[in-house]
Amino acid sequence: MKIAMIGAGGWGTAMMIELAGRNNDLIMYCRNPARADEMRKTRENGEYLPGAHIPEKIRITSDLEEAVEGAGCVIICTPSHVVEEMAARLKPWLMKDAVVVCASKGLADNEGHRLSEGITKEVAGITDKIVALSGPNHAEEVGIGLPCATVAASAVPEAVQIVQDLYMSPVFRVYRSDDIRGVEYG
């Protein structure tokens, strides 16, 4: 399966590194072309996750269409204030019934709107497989393979199972839930 990570900060980079040991087509979108070039050359995200090696298996692009088109799973890992905008931007290339994972942390605004609500609104009619991924994790720990645990939550059990299957490993534990509100507010 093609997996697109939308966001190349510390958390997005760490989450992609975690997937590198599995048999998937991995691509990470970085909005800054110069930074994407630097990451391709050095195989490191020196700005946000120094010291963590980015395996060659992970393609890095600054072209959103290239990242999203054909992806069965799209993981949005941007600052919370741009999650909904990013969901709207990727919509033209989003595959029907793709799993869209929100790995960003926080709320959409000061009124308490959840990030998954904005994603759901933007991709309505294309997919209902929206998953919130959250846990007591730090990018610098995940990026170097330290043990961690997270929760994947969705109203669609199949979507949660896909995310659990993608990430579950001896050092990265993924627990399923249907309480997306609780996971996002927790």
Where do the protein language model's features map onto the residues?
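NAD(P)+-binding Rossmann beta1-loop-alpha1 motif at the extreme N-terminus of oxidoreductases
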Residues: 1-50, 59-62, 89
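Glycine-rich beta-alpha junction loops
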Residues: 32, 107, 134-138, 154-156, ...
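Rossmann-like NAD(P)(H) cofactor-binding subdomain of soluble oxidoreductases
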Residues: 54, 61-69, 73-147, 163-164
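Short, conserved active-site loop motifs that form the nucleotide-linked donor/cofactor pocket
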Residues: 57-59, 172
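Conserved Rossmann-fold dehydrogenase catalytic segment
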Residues: 136-143, 170-186
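Conserved anion/nucleotide-ligand pocket segment
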Residues: 147-174
